[in-house]
């Protein structure tokens, strides 16, 4: 490119200047006068070996090619800004737009130039032109299209330019477009801003819709899960009611019922666990007919529950789980299969009966041989004395019935009727228990000694158990508010109320049992006492050798030793009682007769002419004790006979006994006499006096002085003890009397009598006014 004569050399200034410009011609001539002007180039000569021969096209016809391509793309062109209104200007415009008629078509590859090449500014918005800014000219045309209703004239011009039919040579239209270009740009910005706001709002609405759809799907899934759980619970309940479920767990572990959902892969933690809180951990549908909650660990037929036997033989018949007095082929106790008693058969003595719970290894070996029910009964009754109570295994439809089953409905299912004599383990497969959360009649905890080890429970001597059962039956009253003790109805659970207040000792003579058996309020614990029962068929009472009386002391009972005492009677009341340990001198239940429970946890006093309301049960009970003169807290100070309802009142009263009763003439008080004497001997007040025997206060504390001295002595007492004739004591009394008279402590002030008279007058006036 060093050689300027090179035909490939192109001056860059030609792209920015018009060839007709004088400055361009002068500059071009000055650079290299030997190079001819562009018009002098013989570009269309066929014999010339130039660019046409190499590329097969005219080099200077490239502008026409680009213009034609831009027209095919429907991109409008802008004329040169230097064009005017003259005819020469119109030619320049035509040359700039390069418009051809039908006879003069533009050919892309023709070797002959259709128009002379004039290197000028491109009219497209892509390559730019003079005065061009960063905003595309296309956008201004589009905004003018949007504002067609406001300014229709530019739209007509744009349509003409878009259709390429005619070109207006009047520059006023372009000036008009440039004038409206500012307004169009403002409107375009407003529209773009509104479009952006609408787009953002639309995106937010889409997000909200997606959240709502997700929440709806979650709700549908949750409802489906709940529906499945309800269906599973209904299926399990139907299986339990029909008795179709069988125990498939080991003894001592809760039963896990396999539902269809669990079989599909549900975890074991989600299994439905059937629990109970009965005495032996059994669970059955329907529940057994119990007269009242059991208060003993002893089994119904007089022998402890055989936990080891159930664990060793879990697959045996239900009657093998406990001592059954019936034939081995009978699985349940029916209404007609009741016990009959006769003296010719097995004897049962309460004193001679002993039984072990197979806790040692020797008893385990013996258990393997005792498989049949008859052998167990025979071996058990062999140990009884001949003078005991006899039980016959005969089963007869006319056998006598216990008074506990007289009110049983025969039309009821057999399992209801068997609930009194038959343990729970004989009514349904065993399901070991868990603690139940809901406290109802069937889930009341059994009364057990918490201090006794678990492995030692149910292993007491039967004589001791029977004695405890006698005590519980004689002490435990009927449930308040129940007219009879028929089988529990399917209604709301009854409330079991116990009052823990001091009670009287029960009668120690337990030989008279006839009123106990004939009483209508009996529980199933009294089944443990084997007594003659009236025979309905012969209408006579069979005589038996009298059983030795069982004496019972509630204060010495090992079973009830750790529990709070139970009352010997409970007076019916309308409000439930809470467990309180407040001492009282009144009979049990007396205070609660005057308590009325109101809504909003309020309590009203029912004492005549009182009707006070309290917020706490403790406060109303203390208030009623004041009405009834019940003051259990008495002062133990010598000579004091005061008593109080509450303990803190007694404590406050005792402080008054320890008041500072030793007074110095200066007005200072002391609790002890020796402290007063030491104070006076120091001569630091007006009442100071030098005594005959100086008293030196020890620097040690009172506790150390008591530990050092074997006897509780004081200097004053020692001085008085050394006085044989009493002269020192007389002198001390005279000095004290003189000092008190000197300070006016013996003679009352003259205004005291007048003050008492005035107070008496005011009291009399108040009583007259009332």
UniProtKB/Swiss-Prot annotation:
The modified positions for Phosphoserine read 80, 122, 247, 249, 253, 385, 392, 483, 564, 709, 714
What does UniProt give as GO cellular component?
cytoplasm; cytosol; nucleus
Q: What is its main location?
A: nucleus
GO MF terms held by the record: cis-regulatory region sequence-specific DNA binding; DNA-binding transcription factor activity, RNA polymerase II-specific; RNA polymerase II cis-regulatory region sequence-specific DNA binding; sequence-specific DNA binding; zinc ion binding
Keywords in alphabetical order, please.
Activator, DNA-binding, Metal-binding, Nucleus, Phosphoprotein, Repeat, Transcription, Transcription regulation, Zinc, Zinc-finger
Q: Where in the cell is it found?
A: Nucleus
**Which residue intervals are annotated with compositional bias (Basic and acidic residues) in the record?**
705-745
Q: What does this protein do?
A: Plays a role in regulating basal-level expression of CUP1. Activates EGT2 transcription in the absence of SWI5.
Chain spans, region Disordered: 77-97, 286-323, 699-770
The organism's taxonomy opens as:
Eukaryota, Fungi, Dikarya, Ascomycota, Saccharomycotina
Q: What else is on record for this protein?
A: Present with 538 molecules/cell in log phase SD medium.
**BP terms from Gene Ontology:** G1/S transition of mitotic cell cycle; negative regulation of transcription by RNA polymerase II; positive regulation of antisense RNA transcription; positive regulation of septum digestion after cytokinesis; positive regulation of transcription by RNA polymerase II; regulation of transcription by RNA polymerase II
Family matches, as PANTHER family: METALLOTHIONEIN EXPRESSION ACTIVATOR-RELATED, ZINC FINGER PROTEIN ZIC AND GLI
Q: Where is the composition biased (Polar residues)?
A: 294-304, 754-770
Residues in C2H2-type zinc fingers run 603-627, 633-657, 662-685
List-wise, which residues carry Phosphothreonine?
259, 486, 501
The disulfides recorded in the entry are: none
Q: Which superkingdom? A: Eukaryota
What protein am I looking at? Metallothionein expression activator
